[in-house]
Amino acid sequence: MTLKPVREVSPGSQEGEERLEQSLRPATFEEYVGQEKLVENFRVYAKAARARGEALDHVLLSGPPGLGKTSLAHILARELGVALHVTSGPALVKKGDLAGLLTALAPRDILFIDEIHRLSPAVEEALYPAMEDYRFDVVLGAGLGAQTMEMKLERFTLVGATTRTGLLASPLRDRFPIQERLGYYEPTELREIAVRAARKLALPVDPAGAEELARRARGTPRIAIRLLQRARDFAQVEGDGTLTREIVETTLERLEVDGRGLDAMDRRILAVVLDTFGGGPVGIDAVAAAVGEERDTLEDVYEPFLVREGFLARTPRGRVALPPAYAHLGRERPQGKQGSLI
């Protein structure tokens, strides 16, 4: 079996990171950096629900991975003074898995379902009456003799997190009274996140080092923390233990992360579109085959950053390389290449 190398600039969570993320996770709204309007809204929602002694309305958090959706769920539970029960869409295989979680909830508890867009149809359907009427229907028997037994549930809050809102069925999406989308972070916010994390790790940080790390973290706190970990290793072994600009630059050079935050696979994707397919338009399946990746991985992990930074465009005819892609890879743009997005 061939193991793929760990990708330091992947926004998705990687094996073994959960414990560190928990230790660095903000504990309160005051500690949460970025997403100011969203955080202020949740501060009001949580305070009002707690004052009334009610469960918070169901919440849907959407946005790219690594932006703090799980951290928000933890903070909400702490602010409300209730327990947080964590699971994920792929982990809920059958209705019984969901029943076990729902019946264990105390009044006003929060059930957090990550990747909620990956729920099976059967589990999703069973969730509807639980969200609306706080009941779970159990079917006893089969065929014409089947009977439905209704199990009453405590009033709870479902917090769903998704990176792909478009994959949610409308009946599920419409059952969330509170829907908020997290956006990418500014370099100044990522710098503050990196400095706070370094303080918890007892790592001295030079302001220029934190600024350089934040600039290349692709607008994503999870990536900033991951790069900070790797830079800490280089600071300890090849420096004096301080995170300086030179140490950060050395770290990212060794990880093949360039000045725009692109890694080797990002550059390979751009090179394929430019060199193999003449800059496009080219279908995503052709690109996936050329770089040896799954289509879904390209669409969910790699493309969002390349599109956001203006290297690629998604068009009805396929992917098209934009002028910054030619410039970044040092390619001459073919004469007469208009880069039409139509």
From Swiss-Prot:
GO molecular function, one term: ATP hydrolysis activity
Any single GO CC term annotated in Swiss-Prot or TrEMBL for this entry: cytoplasm
Reaction(s) this enzyme catalyzes, per UniProt: ATP + H2O = ADP + phosphate + H(+)
Pfam families attached to this UniProt entry: AAA_lid_4, RuvB_C, RuvB_N
Annotated stretches, region: Small ATPAse domain (RuvB-S): 186-256
Binding sites annotated in the UniProt record for DNA: 295, 314, 319
Disulfide bonds: none
Domain of life: Bacteria
UniProt keywords, alphabetically: ATP-binding, Cytoplasm, DNA damage, DNA recombination, DNA repair, DNA-binding, Hydrolase, Nucleotide-binding
Region feature Head domain (RuvB-H), mapped onto this chain: 259-342
EC number: 3.6.4.-
InterPro entries associated with the record: AAA+_ATPase, AAA_lid_4, DNA_helicase_Holl-junc_RuvB, P-loop_NTPase, RuvB-like_N, RuvB_C, WH-like_DNA-bd_sf, WH_DNA-bd_sf
Localization (cell): Cytoplasm
GO terms, biological process: DNA recombination; DNA repair
Enzyme category, top tier: hydrolase
Stretch list, region Large ATPase domain (RuvB-L): 1-185
Positions annotated to bind Mg(2+): 70
Region (Disordered): 1-22
Protein family per UniProt: Belongs to the RuvB family.
PANTHER family found in the cross-reference section: HOLLIDAY JUNCTION BRANCH MIGRATION COMPLEX SUBUNIT RUVB (PTHR42848:SF1), PTHR42848
Comment, domains: Has 3 domains, the large (RuvB-L) and small ATPase (RuvB-S) domains and the C-terminal head (RuvB-H) domain. The head domain binds DNA, while the ATPase domains jointly bind ATP, ADP or are empty depending on the state of the subunit in the translocation cycle. During a single DNA translocation step the structure of each domain remains the same, but their relative positions change.
HAMAP family documented for this protein: DNA_HJ_migration_RuvB
This protein's name: Holliday junction branch migration complex subunit RuvB
Organism of origin: Anaeromyxobacter sp. (strain Fw109-5)
This protein's encoding gene: ruvB
